[in-house]
């Protein structure tokens, strides 16, 4: 089976879009494996909630097509830039205007940094599917992979839980759990997404509490 065939019945569209992504440099948290995990989440959610799989195929494959580093001052614009690039790519493929508009909105609204409300079912599904990948075991791995790539320490050895300092996930990987990851489960858009998120949130909490138990100085 090819990668494009994983997106059946939209494997032809997927093949065209995957070809556009072949030469794009990206970090390990937003690579092809991430796209496939998000697609798996999309399928799980849409199997219950519904949604247009053609729109979801394109939105999944293109939602990170413009890479803006996590430490960039332009990070909040990443989803808008990706949505603009997605529109251009789909226009070249002569996709219907209504489909392009739906894909563009889903991409714009998926990002935590963009802080936009998803207005369509497809946008809600993509946002949930992408955020699920920030939770659970894979979310833990992605958090530390990104922090390591940015040269950030794992935690503050004198105050790992930030009891006497401000949380700062630009300096400590563990702080990202409190500033973002542990808040995500309450922000899901679909009932199916919320169910899946609760399971992965429990994994995060178990890891976080165990980590603190091992590193907190007595």
Protein language model regions, located:
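Divalent metal-dependent phosphate-bond-processing catalytic cores, especially two-metal-ion Mg2+/Mn2+ enzymes
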Residues: 2-5, 24-49, 62, 115-218
């Amino acid at each position: 089976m090819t990668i494009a065939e994983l997106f059946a019945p939209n494997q032809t569209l997927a093949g065209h879009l995957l070809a556009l992504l072949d030469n794009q440099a990206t970090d390990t948290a937003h690579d092809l494996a991430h796209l496939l995990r998000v697609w798996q989440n999309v399928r799980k959610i849409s199997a219950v909630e519904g949604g247009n799989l053609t729109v979801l195929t394109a939105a999944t494959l293109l939602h990170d097509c413009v890479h803006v580093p996590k430490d960039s001052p332009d990070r909040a614009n990443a989803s808008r830039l990706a949505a603009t690039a997605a529109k251009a790519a789909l226009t070249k493929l002569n996709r219907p205007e209504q489909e392009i508009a739906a894909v563009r909105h889903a991409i714009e609204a998926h990002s935590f940094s963009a802080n936009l409300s998803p207005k369509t079912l497809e946008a809600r599904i993509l946002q949930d599917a992408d955020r699920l990948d920030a939770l659970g075991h894979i979310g833990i791995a992605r958090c530390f992979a990104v922090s390591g790539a940015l040269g950030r320490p794992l935690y503050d050895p004198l105050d790992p839980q930030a009891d006497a300092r401000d949380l700062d996930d630009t300096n400590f990987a563990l702080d990202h759990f409190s500033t973002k990851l542990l808040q995500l489960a309450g922000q899901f858009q679909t009932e199916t997404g919320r169910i899946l998120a609760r399971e992965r949130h429990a994994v995060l909490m178990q890891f976080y509490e165990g980590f603190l138990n091992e590193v907190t100085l007595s």
